[in-house]
């Protein structure tokens, strides 16, 4: 079973917000944003290999989707929104397309890739993620994290935010992170764009104004896009006030 943390009880008649963190994160990642949505009950999940779910094994997207469903059932949650960042966003998209749909009210994605349509691209990405996984298993975590956050997708991080992320992520277990990275590699994820376009529930993708790559990915996938100003890939960290405002607006007016 996945470890969880109830961030707030909210109002009993509202659906729950289920918060899914990115790779290397934990249930604390969404705390600031959830606090700006106090009307909604909020449950943050530790994904396999992370936080208090460090010993939980995950072998595939189907696996984590089933684990999420079991976790919601354990908590008696019948109506919910999924909110996911990066890896958490990809998991949320997969769950919405291939998981148990009962009770899902909508999906809010931050910087999540809907998938690669080209098989050759998927093979390249799987090799890329496998190489990173080997580094997480074999090298000192501090060194791997320092290199991880120098990747182009994180180019807009300020030095302060980059150092803070490295510090916060340093208590991860490298081997557990590696296992989850391989199990949920973008190279093993199907292209979800066609199904996401036909979802029976509302969906939106939030991207930082400076995250041009993921803005284009979202447009190419034909998905609804909203821009968070003064932010890059990790827009909920860079501009929490604006991110929370966009999220709240969509929850209230999902059409």
Curated annotation (Swiss-Prot):
Pathway: Quinol/quinone metabolism; 1,4-dihydroxy-2-naphthoate biosynthesis; 1,4-dihydroxy-2-naphthoate from chorismate: step 3/7; Quinol/quinone metabolism; menaquinone biosynthesis
Any one Gene Ontology BP term: menaquinone biosynthetic process
EC category name: lyase
GO molecular function: 2-succinyl-6-hydroxy-2,4-cyclohexadiene-1-carboxylate synthase activity
Keyword flag Amino-acid biosynthesis: no
This protein's record includes keyword S-adenosyl-L-methionine: no
Catalysed reactions listed for this entry: 5-enolpyruvoyl-6-hydroxy-2-succinyl-cyclohex-3-ene-1-carboxylate = (1R,6R)-6-hydroxy-2-succinyl-cyclohexa-2,4-diene-1-carboxylate + pyruvate
EC code(s) of this entry: 4.2.99.20
NCBIfam families: menH_SHCHC, PRK11126.1
Its job: Catalyzes a proton abstraction reaction that results in 2,5-elimination of pyruvate from 2-succinyl-5-enolpyruvyl-6-hydroxy-3-cyclohexene-1-carboxylate (SEPHCHC) and the formation of 2-succinyl-6-hydroxy-2,4-cyclohexadiene-1-carboxylate (SHCHC).
Protein family: Belongs to the AB hydrolase superfamily. MenH family.
Subunit field text: Monomer.
Protein name (database record): 2-succinyl-6-hydroxy-2,4-cyclohexadiene-1-carboxylate synthase
Native organism: Serratia proteamaculans (strain 568)
Name of the gene encoding the protein in the UniProt record: menH
């Amino acid at each position: 079973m996945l470890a969880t943390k109830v961030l707030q009880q909210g109002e009993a008649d509202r659906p729950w917000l289920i918060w899914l963190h990115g790779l290397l994160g934990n249930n604390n990642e969404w705390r600031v944003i959830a606090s700006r949505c106090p009307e909604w009950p909020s449950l943050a999940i530790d994904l396999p290999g992370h936080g208090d779910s460090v010993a939980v094994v995950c072998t595939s997207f189907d696996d984590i989707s089933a684990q999420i469903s079991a976790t919601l059932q354990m908590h008696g949650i019948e109506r919910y929104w999924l909110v996911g960042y990066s890896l958490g966003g990809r998991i949320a998209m997969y769950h919405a397309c291939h998981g148990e749909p009962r009770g899902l009210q909508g999906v809010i994605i931050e910087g999540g890739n809907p998938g690669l349509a080209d098989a050759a691209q998927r093979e390249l990405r799987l090799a890329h993620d496998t190489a990173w996984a080997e580094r997480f298993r074999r090298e000192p975590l501090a060194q791997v994290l320092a290199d991880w956050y120098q990747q182009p997708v994180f180019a807009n991080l300020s030095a302060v935010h980059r150092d803070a992320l490295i510090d916060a992520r340093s208590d991860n277990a490298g081997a557990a992170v590696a296992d989850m990275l391989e199990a949920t590699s973008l190279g093993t994820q199907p292209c979800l764009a066609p199904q996401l376009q036909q979802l029976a529930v509302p969906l939106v993708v939030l991207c930082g104004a400076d995250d041009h790559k993921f803005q284009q990915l979202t447009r190419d996938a034909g998905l609804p896009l909203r821009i968070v100003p003064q932010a890059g890939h990790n827009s909920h960290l860079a501009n929490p006030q604006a991110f929370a405002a966009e999220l709240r607006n969509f929850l209230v007016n999902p059409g």
